[in-house]
Amino acid sequence: MIAVCDHNSARNLPAVKAAADRMNVLLLPGMELTTREEAHMLCYFRTVQACMAFGEAIYAHLAPTPNNERFFGRQQVMNERDEEIDVEERLLIGALDLPFEACAARIREAGGLCVPAHINR
């Protein structure tokens, strides 16, 4: 079993799911949210589709800060053949405009499970 959780995005999950299926590995679809307080929260869903729908809803709460590729690298969206199909221009590691409690509530409302990340910080 693996879980792949990109920051504030689920767009690479279809490619990860295809790779996991080829290798007979169970995928737990997820994302890592950065809350308004800059706390990190993992969220897991039963299906890739549910996680992607949640990711689309969360995207509206991400600051429109552009990614600095020289500093953060290219934010690629890949397909199942490991080919780039898109580049995310918005900085994905930025904080959402939602506080921790609101993120947790939205995850639960969407049928997901939330787990605080990096709790030693």
Predicted regions located by residue number:
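Extended substrate/RNA-proximal surfaces in nucleic-acid metabolism proteins
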Residues: 19-121
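Active-site environment of divalent metal-dependent phosphoester hydrolases
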Residues: 4-14, 34-36, 121
